[in-house]
Regions:
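Extended, compositionally biased low-complexity polar/Lys-Gly-rich tracts
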Residues: 31-33, 198-200, 220
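Poly-acidic low-complexity segments
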Residues: 52, 202, 228-231
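Active-site flanking residues adjacent to catalytic metal/cofactor-binding acidic residues
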Residues: 137, 201, 214
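A short glycine-rich, hydrophobically flanked beta-strand micro-motif that places a catalytic Asp/Glu
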Residues: 146, 196-207
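C-terminal active-site "lid" helix and adjoining low-complexity regulatory extension at the edge
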Residues: 194, 207-243
Length: 243
């Protein structure tokens, strides 16, 4: 049996880096075709998938994979000790009268997350299902945002991606790295049992509040930024379960 990871047919810097990282690994990364259809003769050998969430879900069904991810309402259950902001999870219609609020749909598909002066400012609002579930939070200013690929409660690789209102993948300072790892250890000791063993966690510094959890994302569809591709690949593989 081959250990095949199905790659989205859409070429990205991340998928190209994963492909390169797999050269001396036990894994074979294959894009197959542009039809999002894994040929029958390869389906038993596909042990993981990486790409857009819709693509991954289609391939998972074809190849009998379980894609691990946190529960939809997971973030709303995390203590403010770690989020440093109030987070709510409810139907979109329940926030119709809120102003100056951050909103993100729980399925990551309905609309682009962001800060909105009014909920009705969401692009395409009139066509949205008002019963759909969303996260909301108070608006905060992030001074730094960092992506972490986590396996078995350990950060395997990490990369900054946002600093002072600009895209930035430069290395953390020694103090930032030390403080983030300390924050992560305190967080994971309390919440490890609520997460899959392979997951992507984003942490950051909120102005005036310090280190905080941003969110959790499935490894099988998360961007790498400047993370070590070989280490990220192992987390991605472990985030998919062959049934």
């Amino acid at each position: 049996m081959k250990n095949i990871i199905a790659l989205s047919p859409i070429y990205t810097e991340d998928s190209n880096n994963l492909k390169k990282a797999s050269i001396n690994s036990p894994y074979e990364l294959n894009r197959f075709n542009a039809k999002w259809n894994v040929p029958e003769e390869f389906r038993d050998d596909v042990i993981a998938v990486y790409g857009e969430d819709i693509y991954a879900e289609i391939v998972a069904e074809q190849c009998n994979l379980t894609l691990t991810k946190p529960k939809d309402n997971w973030l709303a259950g995390i203590s403010e000790q770690f989020t440093k902001r109030k987070i709510s999870y409810d139907q979109l219609k329940d926030f119709a009268n809120e102003e100056n609020i951050f909103i993100k749909c729980s399925d990551f598909k309905s609309f682009k997350a962001g800060v909105f002066d009014k909920v009705t400012d969401i692009k395409g609002f009139d066509s949205l299902d008002l019963n759909s579930m969303v996260f909301t939070s108070e608006v905060v200013e992030w001074e730094l945002e960092v992506r972490c690929f986590v396996l078995n409660n350990e950060i395997k690789t990490h990369s900054s991606y946002w600093r002072n209102n600009a895209f930035d993948t430069n290395s953390l300072s020694k103090t930032e790295q030390k403080d983030m790892f300390e924050f992560f250890q305190n967080f994971i000791q309390k919440y490890a049992e609520t997460l899959p063993k392979a997951i992507v966690l984003d942490f950051g510094i909120i102005k005036g509040k310090g280190w905080a959890l941003i969110e959790a994302n499935p490894a099988w569809c998360s961007g790498l930024y400047d993370c070590d591709a070989a280490k990220a690949l192992e987390v991605i593989v472990q985030s998919c379960i062959k049934n």
